[in-house]
């Protein structure tokens, strides 16, 4: 199967230099802590949420010893229970839709920072649900196309048999889409089958994309996304800007 899908643009990610990697690892460490607390176990085999966060960590090249250290720390750190999941939705230039997922121990601080990021980019925070209907929540697994040159059909049958909803061929990759509830099982089946994955996580995929042509609009949305990326409380940012 083939189709229009921009997996590289679904989530805004800046170039991963050392400083950016450090910030990403810190945010994932927070997710690991919350997954251990809310999942009730530090054992990934008994905690599907923790398994998913570990997959996300590996997709971001987080070293195994760093992952293990975060899990061990979370097992004896009750402060993670104070973090709250809060999702913000809003609009950027020309009606672009932006979803911001946060983990925070200070709602007022986070709300103020997120609002400021939207305002600085000439956008605004909206009400819950104002843009989320424009996205589909899916498990998304990306495979390097070079690994399966000439055997795409066999790979497609393998992942569909594992429970995937769709198999999309892109220019440089194959993209496997799953129902969020099936993501862990599909990812595990692919892992056990020895299928190498570039990335694997549950994400929000835009149903349509908005193109920006005005340089001012592009600068504004970039400013908003950069400010959100730099906020320690922000875990993930999804948007429908056709970069």
Model regions and ranges:
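Positively charged, low-complexity, intrinsically disordered RNA-binding extensions
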Residues: 140-243
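N-terminal cationic and glycine-rich segments that engage phosphates or anionic surfaces
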Residues: 1-126, 130-142, 239-242
């Amino acid at each position: 199967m083939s189709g229009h899908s921009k997996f590289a643009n679904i989530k805004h990610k800046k170039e991963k230099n050392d400083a950016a990697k450090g910030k990403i690892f810190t945010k994932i460490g927070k997710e690991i802590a919350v997954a251990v607390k809310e999942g009730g176990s530090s054992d990934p085999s008994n905690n599907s949420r923790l398994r998913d966060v570990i997959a996300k960590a590996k997709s971001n090249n987080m070293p195994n010893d760093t992952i293990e250290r975060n899990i061990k720390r979370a097992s004896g750190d009750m402060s993670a229970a104070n973090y709250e999941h809060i999702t913000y939705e809003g609009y950027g230039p020309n009606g672009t839709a932006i979803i911001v997922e946060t983990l925070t121990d200070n709602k007022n601080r986070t709300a103020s920072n997120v609002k400021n990021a939207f305002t600085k980019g000439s956008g605004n925070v909206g009400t819950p649900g104002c843009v989320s209907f424009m996205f589909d929540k899916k498990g998304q697994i990306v495979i390097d196309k070079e690994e399966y040159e000439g055997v795409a059909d066999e790979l497609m049958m393998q992942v569909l048999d594992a429970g995937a909803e769709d198999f999309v061929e892109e220019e440089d990759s194959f993209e496997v889409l799953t129902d969020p509830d099936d993501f862990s099982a599909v990812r595990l089946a692919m892992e056990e089958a020895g299928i190498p994955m570039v990335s694997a996580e549950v994400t929000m995929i835009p149903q349509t994309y908005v193109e920006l042509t005005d340089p001012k609009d592009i600068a504004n949305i970039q400013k908003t996304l950069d400010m959100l990326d730099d906020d320690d409380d922000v875990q993930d940012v999804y948007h429908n800007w056709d970069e």
